């Protein structure tokens, strides 16, 4: 399935046969987080079982997926942000304030770019385990994506809550989908519970001062909702 899609991960495997489908799950492929199963599953299996044979079996799944994202990125100038295409974002999150909405409030470009970094990083690590010299390419790619995320989403050690990604292709598609399906505009934000947690969990901040500020803001967000996730 992945080979037929030039390396993109399908939403379903096997891909269902459809005729004149309008459902984007049936007509699209290659979205962050969902598609990143291609790197997360082999990485997690290796961490638990340390089986290099199994890792080698699924290594192309990892490299093909990251290569597909990289090619899309390069075709748009090599900006090292995944701020283009159709994204699920923080799917089914409850913080948009719109009843019945499947769209969360978190900037989908932030989520997609973070997972671009994570998948490149995981792929580099697994290639290193197998002593494959391709690891350097993915390590460098992960470093470049991480640096771009920090440059885009931080001003010094302060979180930038009005980044350029709020005017990105991803955001325009997201708002168009919200209008088409519900006639609403989504209040997109960076400092959501999800946005803050992703940045903290994966070390996507410039320094420890920034880290502490993110952690404090996440605690405030939790307190605002009486300890509940949104």
Where do the PLM segments sit?
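Active-site core of glycosidic bond-cleaving carbohydrate-active enzymes
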Residues: 1-230
């Amino acid at each position: 399935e992945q080979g037929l899609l030039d390396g993109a991960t399908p939403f379903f495997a096997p891909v269902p046969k459809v005729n004149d489908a309008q459902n984007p799950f049936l007509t699209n492929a290659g979205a962050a987080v969902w598609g990143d199963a291609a790197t997360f599953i082999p990485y997690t299996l290796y961490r638990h079982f340390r089986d290099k044979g199994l890792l080698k079996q699924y290594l192309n799944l990892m490299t093909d997926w990251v290569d597909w994202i990289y090619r899309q990125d390069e075709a748009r100038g090599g900006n090292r942000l995944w701020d283009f295409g159709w994204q699920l974002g923080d799917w089914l999150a409850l913080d948009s304030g719109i009843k019945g909405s499947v769209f969360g409030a978190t900037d989908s470009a932030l989520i997609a770019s973070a997972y671009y970094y994570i998948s490149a990083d995981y792929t580099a690590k697994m290639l290193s385990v197998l002593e494959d010299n391709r690891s350097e390419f993915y390590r460098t790619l992960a470093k470049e994506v991480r640096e771009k995320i920090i440059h885009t989403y931080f001003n010094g050690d302060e979180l930038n809550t009005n980044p350029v990604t709020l005017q990105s292709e991803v955001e325009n598609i997201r708002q168009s989908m919200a209008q088409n399906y519900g006639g609403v505009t989504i209040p997109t934000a960076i400092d959501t519970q999800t946005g803050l947690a992703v940045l903290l969990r994966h070390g996507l901040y410039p320094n420890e001062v920034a880290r502490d500020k993110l952690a404090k803001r996440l605690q405030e967000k939790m307190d605002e909702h009486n300890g509940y996730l949104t």
